[in-house]
Amino acid sequence: MPESLPDHLAVMSETVADWTPDQLRCGDLDGESSPCEIGAHKASVEFVVWGDSHAQATFEALEQAAHHSDTKGLFLSRGACPPLPGFQPEGGGFVLGCPAFNEYAMQTINRLQPRSVILIARWVAYRYPHSQKTSAATAEDAMLALVHTLQESGIRVAIMDEVPYSAYCIPSTFGTGI
């Protein structure tokens, strides 16, 4: 199929699986990966990055920023698993083991007591209408509870917003025009 696409669309299709070895090693896509230390080689972790595959997409930039600022971080990500303990979307939609992964992330954060936690996810995927009051918690409720818990422990919280969301699959939409 890619050989039948115009050059500009073929380039787009090739980047779909364009993950670096470190992104693959440090992103818990398979349920087997371990958290990765990023940045400077120091004794204590100063920040934790926690999120879904959108966090994983930021890995290289955060790794470089941590090195540049001489700080050490821990990277925890799992695809299709928002960093929202207690949240279950209506009708499921999580990868197997997401609640356990989030519990592990919270235990790790509580043990390390970093100065900051950076939460990164494809937030739109977990908002209404996917999040219903009949779920264990709505995404908003889970986010507020998490931020409160972390701040009560003296941890600063940063939430990275997602890139602008398109209601259409851009590559598919381009593809239908050829």
Residue spans of the language-model regions?
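Extracellular/periplasmic envelope-modification machinery, especially enzymes
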Residues: M1-I178
